[in-house]
A protein has these predicted regions:
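Residue-level signature of catalytic and energy-coupling elements of molecular machines
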Residues: 13, 19, 38, 59, ...
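Conserved G1/Walker A P-loop phosphate-binding module
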Residues: 1-57, 207
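C-terminal effector modules of nucleic-acid-centric enzymes and ribosome-associated factors
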Residues: 8, 108, 119-123, 133, ...
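Conserved catalytic-core segments of large NTP-driven translation/proteostasis enzymes
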Residues: 116, 133-277
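Conserved nucleotide-binding/hydrolysis micro-motifs of P-loop NTPases
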Residues: 63-64, 87-90, 106, 115-119, ...
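Conserved Switch II/interswitch segment of TRAFAC-class P-loop GTPases
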Residues: 61-64, 75-96, 106-125
């Protein structure tokens, strides 16, 4: 089925809602207030379907006080019905809506001159020619113009047939599904149902989606597209999703939905902006179905000779937003339209102003190779490609292909990280520092990567492989050149036992002890196994090892408590031993092995 999403646009009372009703019989003004006032206040959604063609309509309000509602409805549309009354011609909101369509990237326009039954030929001609002249000021593609009256069925039928035959190429980023909730319903017997416009790739019945604003992953229990159950929903379709999650109550109107793990939220967006704005201006950012308070920082103004007034700006937001590269937005100031633009860098970058402007120019021109080079040189300890769909509008596989063209770069394909070659040298210096301060250090690529969160295991192994003149290797471990490996193991055992004993009844966790000796976790685990096999260390829990003599001390103290109080439980033992609940429970359970002790409910007592 071919599916197209159309938004209406135009001045208040120019006949947008009446035109859609004439096309498909749907009454968009459904509330009492809308009917009483004769204007559209909220968004309404309907469709026209025939012979495999589906035209979805978003009827938006034309009143100047409802700009945010108009923007939230129009943002996902592929084309627009620009509705202009033949008797009034272009009015204030007509012009404003035209600008918004331009800012939102809605290039396909069907011009609808309405109320032709009550206008003269001169009025109709003037309204049409003036509208076309205004549209020519922008980069619009006017598909066709219609002279209409809702009382002239032939004119409505001509528009209807044109729309049903219309085909528009999908230009949306298809990397991932993106979905902003514009309405929520609780339906008896079904639960929570969200509606919104699906952009990008498809979603499937039974699949999983993630609400990034609420932090809730949910299942798709059922889906409908224009009141019909579907197993797959595609780009530019109006989709109702029946949400399956015990945390569904956290989901709110305006939330952003996609696949989990592909987006990060930030309070800053770097953008190209078209319009008029001053540095430090307080604005409302309209993006998707959201409206967020923001402050604009102007990075640079327009270049000489540019047709439109444009700026690179940074928007500092009141709350996090999960925006995407090239996502369209509109800015309002005091309720008035300031302009609009595109997000170029949705990920907050700690760049100086000059470097940031360079990056934005590269992103504006989609020169991703140059952008990757700048980011590689800026982030000496690597930058990731996992969120490349959000960051650059391309899949990680495509980002990897670009990264492989970089010079003086190391690419970790498994971890999707890009490093400058200097990162490897930094790792070598780090390893040299470890073995210089601790001659007993035993390392692996894994242990080095654990100590430096920015370094991947692959990068660590590359650095180690180039240090063969400085390191020896045995049993999967690297250590200082010339050191006796068997003595290193003995020294490690002695050191671990010493640290466990030093902790008395509250010993450190094994991994914390391993860090003291700069040893690989496997080497530390092997040393602990040897100590427990010898009986000098006892394992009480997954992460709790105590020396045998200190365990005897713990049991002795608990027996003293029982002698004093007649019993030992978590409450009195915790206070008596001055330990955390974790340690106290472990020692009480160890005491259960003493044949003199019996457990009655949660209390340990001496057998009678």
């Amino acid at each position: 089925m071919s599916s197209i999403l159309l938004a209406s646009a135009g001045h208040i009372d120019h006949g947008k809602t009446a035109l859609i009703k004439a096309l498909n019989g749907f009454e968009g003004d459904s509330t009492d207030e809308e009917k009483r006032r004769g204007i559209t206040i909220d968004l309404s959604f309907s469709h026209l379907e025939k012979n495999g063609a589906n035209i979805a309509f978003i009827d938006v309000p034309g009143h100047e006080n409802l700009l945010k509602t108009m923007i939230s409805g129009a943002f996902g549309a592929e084309a627009a019905l620009l509705v202009v009354s033949s008797t009034e011609g272009l009015k204030a909101q007509s012009l404003e809506h035209i600008k918004i369509l331009e800012f939102l990237g809605i290039k396909k326009i069907i011009l609808c001159i309405t109320k032709c039954d009550i206008a003269s030929k001169e009025q109709i001609s003037h309204s049409k020619s003036a509208s076309l002249a205004e549209l020519r000021k922008y980069d619009f593609d006017v598909l066709k113009s219609f002279e209409l009256s809702i009382f002239d069925s032939s004119s409505i039928e001509a528009l209807r047939q044109f729309l049903l035959a219309l085909r528009i190429e999908n230009t949306q980023n298809s990397c991932l599904p993106r979905y902003y909730i514009d309405r929520l319903f609780n339906i008896k017997g079904a639960g929570l149902v969200a509606t919104g416009t699906l952009l990008g790739s498809s979603i499937e019945l039974g699949g999983k989606l993630y609400d990034y604003d609420a932090g809730v992953e949910f299942g798709i229990r059922s889906m409908q597209v224009h009141d019909k159950p579907v197993s797959v929903a595609n780009n530019a379709q109006r989709v109702a999703i029946n949400i399956s999650s015990p945390l569904a109550h956290k989901i709110k109107k305006g939330d952003f939905i996609s696949k989990k793990g592909n987006f990060r939220g930030f309070k800053e967006l770097d953008c190209v902006f078209f319009g008029s704005i001053t540095h430090g201006a307080e604005v409302s950012l309209c993006i998707g179905t959201k409206s967020i308070n923001a402050k604009a920082s102007v990075l640079s103004s327009k270049k000489e000779g540019e047709k439109n007034e444009s700026y690179f700006i940074t928007l500092k937001l009141d709350k996090e937003v999960f925006a995407s590269f090239d996502e369209r937005f509109v800015l309002l100031g005091g309720g008035a339209l300031l302009g609009g633009g595109r997000v170029l860098n949705p990920i907050s970058e700690p760049l100086k102003k000059r470097a940031k402007i360079q990056l934005l120019i590269m992103l504006l021109e989609r020169d991703f190779l140059a952008a990757f080079e700048l980011l590689k040189n800026t982030h000496k300890k690597g930058f990731g490609l996992l969120c490349s769909a959000q960051r650059f509008g391309i899949l990680p596989s495509s980002a990897l292909k670009i990264a492989k063209e970089l010079k003086n770069a190391i690419i970790d394909e498994d971890e999707l990280n890009v490093y400058d070659t200097s990162a490897k040298e930094s790792l070598k210096d780090f390893i040299r520092f470890i073995i210089s301060k601790n001659e007993l250090a035993m390392l692996s690529a894994s242990s080095v990567a654990l100590k430096l969160p920015w370094a991947s295991k692959m990068l660590a192994q590359m650095a180690i492989d180039e240090m063969k003149s400085e390191l020896d290797f045995e049993n999967g471990l690297y250590f200082k050149k010339g050191a006796d490996f068997s003595k290193l193991k003995e020294s490690l055992e002695e050191g671990i036992l010493r640290e466990i004993e030093r902790g008395v009844l509250a010993p450190l966790a094994p991994y914390n002890i391993y860090d003291i000796f700069e040893c690989d976790r496997k080497a530390g685990d092997d040393a602990l196994k040897r100590l427990t096999a010898r009986g000098v260390v006892v394992r009480l829990e997954h992460n709790l090892f105590i020396s045998a003599k200190n365990l005897d001390l713990a049991k002795k103290r608990l027996l003293e408590l029982i002698a004093r109080d007649g019993y030992a439980d978590v409450s009195n033992a915790k206070d008596f031993l001055n330990l955390s609940r974790k340690y106290t429970i472990a020692y009480l359970e160890a005491l259960d092995n003493d044949e003199r002790i019996e457990k009655i409910e949660n209390k340990r007592v001496l057998k009678s």
